Structure formats: C-alpha cells, structure tokens
Amino acid sequence: MRQSSRLLRLLAFTSSVLACGLCLAQAPDPDGRATPAQRAAAGIGAPVQPLPAASTLAAREQKTRIAAWRTEVRRQLFVPDHLPALEARTWSTFSPTPGVLADRVTYATADGMLVPAIVYRPDPKLLKPHIKLPGLVIVNGHGSDKFGWYAFYSGMLFAKMGAVVVTYDPIGEGERSAVKASHTGEHDAWVSPPAGLPRTDWGQRLAGLMQVDAMQAVSYLLAQPEVDATRIAVAGYSMGGFITGITGAIDTRIHATLLSGGGDYDGPGGYFDSNPLPCQTSPYKSLLPLGDRGAVLYALNAERGPMLVMNGSADTVMDMAHHPPAWFDEVRTRALALIGPSSPAAKNIFTTVLYSDISHRTSWVDRKGVVWLDRQLHFPLSSAERIATEPTTHIGDWVKTNHVYLAEAYAREDREAGLDALGTGLPGIPREDLMALPDADWQRLQDRLTYAAWAGKTRAAEQQAASHSTERQ
C-alpha cells in the first residue's frame, strides 16, 4: 500500500497533478501539530495553485486522474485495496419504538478489529412484499457514539420512514473503549511514530481505521437483501463530517453524502491543518500531495453522487467566520473546473445550507435535511408532502423530558438543543439497550474492540514499517 501506485506514475504524461506549487504558510511543531498561535491565525490557510482543468485533458487522462486521486487518498490513509471480510453478526434484536426494530450487530473493520453497531430498520409487518429500502450510515462527531442522542434519534426517525440505518461506535468510544464509556477522548492522544516514519503516520493510520469503519457500514447495508444498492447515503457530523467527505471521495458505492458542521477543506496551514486532533490534522496534511485538497475532495464526491453541506454562520467549532458562503463558492468553482462544468458529474457538485446565527448542530434531522435526504433516498414509508407538514420535536425540551444526555456545551439554543427535529413521540433509549454485545462476549473480544487493543497492533505495525524503511536505506 505504501509504494507509489501505477496510476500515479501514469499521470506523469499529464500536467503533473501532484506538483502544484504548494507553500505551507506556517511550519508545524515537530510532532505535526500547529502551535496555539498558529491555530488562532490559521484562517483558510495559504492559497493553492489551481490544478489543470478537466477541459485541458483528454477523456482518458481525466479518467486516469480521477482514479489516481482516489488511489492516493487510500494510500495515504492506509485504506486497503480490498476491504476485509464483513464478519457481520447479529447478537440480538429489540424494538425501541413501535414500527422499528433495532439489531445489535458487530462487523469487521481494518486491522482485525470489530465495530459494535445498532442497526435500525422498519418492522417488516409494515412493508409491502419485496420492497427495496434505502440505507443510511450515521457517522458521529468527536466524542460521541451510537449512544448519542442524534444517533438513536436518527435511527428511529429514518427507520420509521422506511430506511435501514447503521449507527456505530467510533474507535475509543462506547464499546470500543476499555471502560465502555462515551466522550472518553481515548484516540485524541498524540503518538510519535518510530524514527524513519512521517510524524503524521499514527494519525494517518487512525484516520484510515475511521474510513474503513464507515465503508464497512456501507458494506453491511449492501449485504442486506432488502437494501437497494443505488439508494445508500452517509451523513456525518463535525469529525464525522470530515470522515464522510473523504469516504464519499473514495467509496463510489455511496449515492449521497451529507455533511453537517463541516466541509471546510481549506488550504495549507488552514483549519484542518492546524486542528489539535490527530484524527484530522495528520490525515489532512498527508493529503497535501493532491494539491488543491478541498477542490479535489469535492470533485471526487461529485464524480460519485450528490452532496449537501449544512452549516451555521455562527459555528465557532468549524470556524465559519473564515469560511463564509463566498469561500464555499470559490472552492465549488475550482472543483467544477476539475470535473468539467458540462460533465455528467457537474450536476452532483455540492450544495450548501447556511443557517444565520446558528452554531454547531446535526441539521440532517431538521426539515431541510430530511427533505434533501428524501430526494436522494426516496423513503418508502413517507412522502415529500408528509415531510413538508410533519410535526417537529424541539430537542432541548425532548432531552429533558426523556432524560437523554446532552453535553452542556451543546445544550444551547444555537447548537443541538435548538434543533427542531422532524417527528414526535420518539423515546429516549436506555444506555444498556444500546450495548451491542453481551458483557461476557465483550470481555472475550476486547482485543478486537478497544482503542487500547488497536493501539498495540498499530505500534507493532509502525515498528515493522520503520524496520523496513531502515533496511531500504
């Protein structure tokens, strides 16, 4: 995986997509992190030299370039050429609300690990015979997991509309934490790789695991006979939006992607390059060989299918002050040039929703988000007319009434608490009901579940890679 790809070598006869005249605005700390002062001054980062427009390339060259970009992203993030065997197992099933079943599931991901998930689906008794259902993957924000309110609210909401919805624990959270807790931040630790490896290596491997987590959730949906392979979407929030934007760029099995609270893939030294989290800074820096990373990622998503980016103008988490509509318009123009304004993919170029005076939140459960998802997925137990008039639930009131946890920082009207989510009468789900594995099995499988177990395997993989690097010198 770490060797130069054949496709990248083929690009030598084009305008050399990887040689783009990049100039880093600020030098990072030795471990790859920006200093606090650099983060504060990051803005949108340094300008990038535009890549050759699609109009300057022959059709064969353009096809090769698209494939090469995808190969390079996978290579940098250690995403294997072939995903692992799914190993899907349903441990048990329960009904969190009438009309919805929830399967407690595990499936395999990268590095021999397992992902615990809750998969929501409509009760078969409500479905017409042989009907095909859309699939939806929810990718959580930083610190959250399948126990988070928006994960299980989304699961019930969209299952009631006729979708199969996968919610899962990111590495280090929920059942992938040694203490089975949420908001642990276990994967936030910066780990310096052995000498001879890039300082970003650990974060690249961590991000690759997160990519395969999401891609295998798609694989799980595709393995279900009732799921329509042409109607699969992935929705990601915050860190999950960062993951989803990259997943959508490399996984063409996905039809639609929705990013809420994110999408600001900017220039060298900008938001993600100066982010303090190894799951974002390191992988984004590793994509510098692409050149205009934001335009390339958005172009690849357009080649795959539709994409919606939802943000609030007052979102300080994602630094929307430096990423106003004009910034998104500019990156959209550059992405369109990379695919060709008249190409079939141009119709899929990302669109945006910007809420005035709103901060960080999961907007795919509000009316605009659900309307867009319905246009892509065609929920069989709902309709455009019903969605337009569906009553809503004010999340701030709902979490109090149902004793659902919401972090204090997000229990604000301009953040998650202020959401008016579609649907009424959905319950809170007790934490114990959202455990995928029986405790005895979780104890037995810890070496395939927890961040600590993954970290041990990854340290060994890095040592081996460093040894091979030394031998080649």
Stretch-by-stretch model annotation:
Residues 112-115, 123-135:
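Proline/glycine-enriched tight loop/beta-turn segments at coil->beta junctions
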Residues 2-12:
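Bacterial N-terminal signal peptides that target proteins for export
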Residues 216-289:
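Primarily recognizes the serine-hydrolase "nucleophile elbow" in alpha/beta-hydrolase
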Residues 129-212, 269-270:
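Cap/lid segment of the alpha/beta-hydrolase catalytic domain
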Residues 23-25:
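Boundary at the C-terminal end of the N-terminal hydrophobic targeting segment
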Residues 266-336:
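The feature captures the conserved acid-bearing segment of alpha/beta-hydrolase catalytic domains
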Residues 27-103, 108-114, 305, 329-473:
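Alpha/beta-hydrolase-fold serine-hydrolase catalytic core, especially in secreted/extracellular enzymes
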